[in-house]
């Protein structure tokens, strides 16, 4: 999605306004049947959790398995933190926003405005962006990067 100014509007338009939750991981056999312990309870994998996308219609999508120390960082929180970094809530433009791999990865870029260099020459305009990236996979850290390279094509 391109060109909306609030984090909420951009996330909604990009279908990235879902929440991610942590769930336990139960062992299943090759046929997909939950394996039960001697008490008849699901056999849980103790050192793993799953990240789960909660969709607007109330359904769930499994995203990844993570360790027990993993803490979910919601897409809205990551984007609002980026807007806080640029000290803006409405005048910086959330340029692009989206998710990859069914929601496992989130990205956004905030247009910080152009910088004119060499005003007596060719007047090159360098676009500046704050890139935001996060993964709900336990492997991709939250990244905030200042860049002059567009993260996605126009």
Where are the regions that the model predicts?
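Feature for intrinsically disordered/low-complexity regulatory segments and propeptides
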Residues: 1-81, 90
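Intrinsic disorder/low-complexity polar-acidic segments
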Residues: 80-154
């Amino acid at each position: 999605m391109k060109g909306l100014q609030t984090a909420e509007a951009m996330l909604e338009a990009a279908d990235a306004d879902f929440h991610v939750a942590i769930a336990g991981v139960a062992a299943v056999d090759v046929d997909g049947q939950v394996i039960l312990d001697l008490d008849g309870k699901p056999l849980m994998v103790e050192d793993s959790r799953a990240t789960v996308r909660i969709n607007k219609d109330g359904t769930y999508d499994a995203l990844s398995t993570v360790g027990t120390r993993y803490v979910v960082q919601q897409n809205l929180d990551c984007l609002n933190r980026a807007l806080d970094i640029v000290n803006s809530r409405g005048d910086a433009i959330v340029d692009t926003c989206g998710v990859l791999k069914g929601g496992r990865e989130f990205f956004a870029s905030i247009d910080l405005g152009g910088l004119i260099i060499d005003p007596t020459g060719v007047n090159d305009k360098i676009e500046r962006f704050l890139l935001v990236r996060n993964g709900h996979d336990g492997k991709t850290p939250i990244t905030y990067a200042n860049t002059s390279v567009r993260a996605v094509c126009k």
